[in-house]
Amino acid sequence: MAPSLVEPVPAFDAPSKVAPNLVAPEPEHCPGPESEQAGKGDACAGCPNQAICASSTPKGPDPDIPIITERLSQIRHKILVLSGKGGVGKSTFSSLLAHAFASNPESTVGLCDTDICGPSIPKMMGVEAETIHVSNAGWSPVWVTDNLGAMSIQFMLPNRDDAVIWRGPKKNGLIKQFLKDVDWGELDYLIVDTPPGTSDEHLSVNTLLKESGVDGAVIVTTPQEVSLLDVRKEIDFCRKAGIRILGLVENMRGFVCPGCSNTSEIFRATTGGGKRLAKKMGIPFLGSVPLDPRVGMACDYGESFVDSYPDSPASMAIKQVVRSVSQMIGEDPDKVLPPDVMAE
């Protein structure tokens, strides 16, 4: 039995918060009808919903957070992957990161796709045709390999080409179910792939995971200034939301020819690129990953680029990023990716 998008099947029953019935759309600067400031904030003055929000049931802690915390208690490390702009290869990088961590057979890795409207992880992992199964223990992730599992809304769509046209609250509800109802079991690493920008999904993930502990976020950019412009906003978002920044990764830094291994600059770092930005913003720089056309091919075929092309400069760069991230979260890089795995 697979969960339905119309009537999701929760693995646990828990009381939900009471949301007021509004008589008008929420204005632009609304603090949120379920927030502590609902009906009381300066932005509420003159709003048709002010009396309704102010008199609704007092807001308390989300009752699902303790359930989520308990559910995720067997996961040692939780890592967010963020980007300020779309198209920088964030989801591709998330899949590469997951494969690289899982290249150590002693590690068990989960990859959660929270890009509700643009899920691409199942395609990249080669499990696009799979569906989610539900048991008394919860939703079962789709296992790509023996030690690498994935979860995405794509597994729940009746037609893989169906558009998901949802507003924030419904997307947030599904993300909550991913965290509350998915039976990951014992994991060494849970990598959470997020949509670009600083949207509702990011706020939900941060709020719901805060109690269970998030190790931090890896921010992905490309060298050109148009990407760095939004990365600065992403860094500011992390600092305001209290999310630790593990570091910045510069993706697509140069094109590596598979034939001769020469490197050509495709996206020129007109303002110094990711390394200079990281230094200026006071965050760690985790490394640059060159552009290899075989990365796209591996993702299209749902294969592990790291395993298929271990000698590629891009593979070596990804493994070095994994070692850097491991060090940032308090793990021994030589145990996460032993020398024999690095040499493969």
UniProtKB/Swiss-Prot annotation:
Residues 1-41 are annotated as: Disordered. Belongs to the Mrp/NBP35 ATP-binding proteins family. NUBP1/NBP35 subfamily. Binds 4 [4Fe-4S] clusters per heterotetramer. Contains two stable clusters in the N-termini of nbp35 and two labile, bridging clusters between subunits of the nbp35-cfd1 heterotetramer. Keywords: 4Fe-4S, ATP-binding, Cytoplasm, Iron, Iron-sulfur, Metal-binding, Nucleotide-binding. The lineage of its organism: Eukaryota, Fungi, Dikarya, Ascomycota, Pezizomycotina. GO terms for cellular component: cytosol. It comes from Aspergillus clavatus (strain ATCC 1007 / CBS 513.65 / DSM 816 / NCTC 3887 / NRRL 1 / QM 1276 / 107). Its main location: cytoplasm. GO terms for biological process: iron-sulfur cluster assembly. Its cofactor is [4Fe-4S] cluster. It holds the Pfam family ParA. Disulfide bonds: none annotated. This is Cytosolic Fe-S cluster assembly factor nbp35. ATP binds at residues 84-91. The gene is nbp35. Heterotetramer of 2 nbp35 and 2 cfd1 chains. Gene3D superfamilies: P-loop containing nucleotide triphosphate hydrolases (3.40.50.300). One of its GO terms (molecular function) is ATP binding.
